[in-house]
Amino acid sequence: MRRGLLFFGLFLISLVIIYMEPIWSYQISPNDGQELPLQSPPPTSLNLESIPTQGTAQWIGQPMKAFSTLYGEAQSVTDSGFGFFRHQFRMDADAFMEVTTINQRITSIKVLGETPMDIGPFKYQMSLEELTTYTVISPIVSVEYGGETYSLELMEDDINYRPLVAFDNGSYAILFFDHQDKRSGLYSLMYLDTETLLKLAPYVLTEGQPQFFVAEKAADWITIDEQKSETSRYLMQQLRRSYDFPAYSTSLALQRETQALLTDFLINQEDYLSTERLRSYQRIQRQELNQNWVLTNQEVRTLVEELDEEKTFAHFEMPVYDPIFTLLSWYSNPYLVSRLFYDESEAIGVAFSKENMLVLFQEINQPTESSEQP
């Protein structure tokens, strides 16, 4: 009897060893991170490791005055309404830079095109494979803020289109990749501090309490919303040109129509949303969750049903605290790219109401005389 039990026990142990061996080997294998095709996940590490600080990353946390002394004054400085200011530098038709500050300290820098900023060790149009020669991309990011530990998780699309890099001065960079044939590779970067990273929430928060930007009650929201609309149209035109697509047509009539549609949606949400969807919107509006909320395809059709549905497409998103960051995310979003890379002539309207953003796209046969390029 004892021999039988001993034999049975040894048999079970052998089965466990045989079954678990490939799993243990997988966990400790040093060769897991192999280079994969461009749109497959690149080599990853379980935890994000920082790289030496260089280039633009050195400016995060520094005084805006020192930055302006070296690079000149911004063409415009505007209030975001969410506790930070936006300093915009429009170099030429192909270059754009925006610096955000809190109390005159730099919290983020976004660069697009050939600006004076040093983006080393990165370079424009580099591939994900090239990025892995400088750092190993991690799906798990742990950060310290306010004495607390926060964990972020990057999904597959994040790793392919918006990977995160950490520098040893405590700053970060979101790298925006485009996988279209016309211009494949890195096309824009956003350098930012920990607070901005947590509040913009570009990745899933898996540990720690969500952090939020708070709308300022005393802010001049009419002016702020108009400024954000103009900036968004400007950047969308710039990105449009970079792909050699026809410039968007814009008109005061379409802009007013977009604003009126956004206002109607915010006032009469029960006409457009189911009870469940309305509750989900309200939860995010009350800042119970820190994640993006967008209209579904069916909700978009309901929203634009009084317009020419065959020629009109709408995209609504909230919360949008930083329009430039949001737009850069759209252009590296595999689900929005079919609309943004539509190569026929279109008119656009862009409207804001605090953290709510609506964009209307309307097909047109040819540019009209009212076309402009804000």
What are these regions (language model features)?
Residues 4-22:
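Hydrophobic membrane-insertion alpha-helices, especially the h-region
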Residues 18-248, 263:
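Short helix/turn-capping signatures at newly exposed starts of structured segments
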Residues 69, 133, 234, 238, ...:
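Charged/polar, solvent-exposed surface patches and flexible loops
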Residues 115-118, 122-170, 282-371:
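A well-ordered secondary-structure block
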Residues 210-216, 367-374:
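Intrinsically disordered, low-complexity repeat and linker tracts
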Residues 222-292, 296, 336-337, 344-348:
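Short, well-ordered surface patches within globular domains
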